[in-house]
């Protein structure tokens, strides 16, 4: 599980939405602007229930968003958007909406569907989601991504290629899916501030050196798709451990890039416009700079690796 500082693990809050509070055009919504962005979105989105896998009776809840293409015959690749430890929040659905705006079919599965007692479109309180997420197994994480990808690729408007992007816990899930190979069509992974599968994990009190040492080269050797990782230098654990990931992936000659944005914090995409009461001006500026640079780079990376049918 991804680790955060005490300041960053605090439950996110949202300001009241209004039509003028929609954030920066061409970038995903922040935590403060997601609700307004979703209400104003011209794209078709809906809740769907899908089976976890073949023969599975229980359902996985997911939010799917389709791009508004001027060409009715155009098909789009799929991007699975994996949420943070806070569950499938309004903010994550806002991210999915921007992914669709950039030309992909975006699907965000609720990885807590089983542990919360069944599929539901009701957003969980952050503290509830944080407690429940510890009950989601690694196998469930990868299976849910595969189930969401398969469902989206079955849609008439989809190509047969998909990528997975994730944040915090979802970033680690993106790594785990890459290590385990995914399903047919898996083409790329983009973990934001989430570490790869480790040799048994590390406790929250572990030092940065211990976290870095726990990253398994044997696990990373199994990665077959291009990976783009992004983090922030002020993330005391994940940002500090990124050089170890970079070194291993380079030694394995994997198709990989890692960017550790100077001054940005854990969760910088969500926190891109946090109020000054929570962030100082330098952090606020660094988070927005990281978002403005990282998002278009990610979109270009996804398009490059999922071009064609």
Residue ranges and their predicted role:
Residues 223, 229-231:
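Short beta-strand/loop motif that positions the catalytic acidic residue
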Residues 73-76, 122-167, 305-308:
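Gly/Ser-rich "nucleophile elbow"/oxyanion-hole loop immediately N-terminal to the catalytic nucleophile
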Residues 112-139, 270-280:
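Cap/lid segment of the alpha/beta-hydrolase catalytic domain
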Residues 90-116:
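Short amphipathic alpha-helix adjacent to the substrate-entry channel of hydrolases
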Residues 255-309:
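C-terminal catalytic histidine-bearing segment of alpha/beta-hydrolase fold enzymes
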Residues 76, 82-87, 233:
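Active-site glycine-rich loops that stabilize anionic/oxyanionic intermediates
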Residues 20-74:
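N-terminal cap/lid segment of alpha/beta-hydrolase-fold proteins
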Residues 145-222:
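Primarily recognizes the serine-hydrolase "nucleophile elbow" in alpha/beta-hydrolase
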């Amino acid at each position: 599980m991804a680790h955060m500082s005490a300041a960053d693990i605090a439950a996110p809050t949202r300001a009241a939405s209004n039509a003028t509070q929609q954030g920066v055009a061409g970038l995903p919504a922040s935590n403060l602007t997601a609700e307004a962005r979703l209400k104003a979105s011209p794209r078709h989105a809906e809740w769907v229930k899908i089976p976890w896998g073949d023969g599975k009776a229980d359902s996985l809840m997911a939010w799917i968003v389709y791009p508004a293409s001027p060409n009715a015959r155009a098909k789009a690749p799929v991007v699975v958007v994996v949420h943070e430890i806070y569950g499938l929040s309004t903010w994550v659905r806002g991210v999915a909406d921007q992914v669709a705006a950039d030309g992909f079919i975006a699907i965000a599965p609720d990885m807590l569907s089983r542990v919360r007692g069944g599929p539901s479109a009701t957003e969980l309180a952050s503290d509830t989601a944080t407690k429940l997420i510890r009950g989601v197994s690694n196998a469930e994480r990868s299976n849910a991504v595969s189930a969401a990808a398969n469902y989206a690729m079955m849609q008439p408007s989809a190509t047969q290629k998909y990528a997975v992007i994730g944040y915090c816990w979802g970033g680690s899930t993106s790594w785990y899916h890459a290590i385990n190979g995914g399903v047919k069509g898996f083409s790329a992974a983009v973990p934001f501030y989430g570490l790869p599968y480790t040799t048994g994990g590390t406790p929250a009190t572990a030092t940065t050196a211990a976290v870095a040492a726990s990253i398994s080269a044997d696990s990373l050797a199994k990665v077959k798709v291009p990976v783009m990782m992004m983090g922030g230098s002020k993330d005391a654990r994940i940002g500090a451990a990124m050089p170890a990931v970079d070194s291993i992936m380079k030694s394995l000659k994997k198709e990989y890039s890692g960017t550790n944005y100077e001054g940005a914090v854990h969760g910088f995409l969500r926190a891109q416009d946090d109020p000054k009461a929570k962030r100082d001006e330098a952090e606020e500026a660094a988070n927005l700079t990281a978002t403005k640079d990282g998002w278009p780079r990610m979109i270009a990376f996804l398009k490059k690796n999922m071009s064609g049918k």
